[in-house]
């Protein structure tokens, strides 16, 4: 199974940006924990972009390349019609996560 993890804007700053709110765990720390949990059960790929268009393209390109997409769209969660449309249009199952529920 191949799982594509997509991370949206400013998640590259985890551990640095407002640690009193978001903590000191970095995106690399989270990626390492996910890899540890997956062990040999899944092929994991992580991508992060501050660009909405890149996230849309990665969702569109996931067909035939990933079995599932896991996305933390960050600030785009509440504002991006383009991401919503891309998720609705893809054949690949998409799971939306947030820092507050992982």
Model region roles, listed by residue range:
Residues 39-45:
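A generic structural motif
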Residues 54-58:
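Short acidic active-site motifs
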Residues 76, 81-102:
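Flexible, gly/pro- and Lys/Arg-enriched active-site loops
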């Amino acid at each position: 199974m191949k799982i594509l993890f997509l991370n949206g804007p400013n998640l590259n700053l985890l551990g640095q940006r407002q640690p009193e709110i978001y903590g000191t765990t970095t995106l690399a720390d989270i990626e390492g924990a996910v890899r540890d949990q997956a062990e040999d059960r899944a092929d994991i790929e992580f991508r992060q972009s501050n660009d909405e268009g890149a996230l849309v393209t990665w969702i569109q390109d996931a067909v035939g390349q990933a079995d599932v997409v896991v996305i933390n769209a960050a600030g785009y969660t509440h504002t991006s019609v383009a991401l919503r449309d891309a998720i609705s249009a893809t054949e690949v199952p998409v799971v939306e996560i947030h820092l507050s529920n992982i």
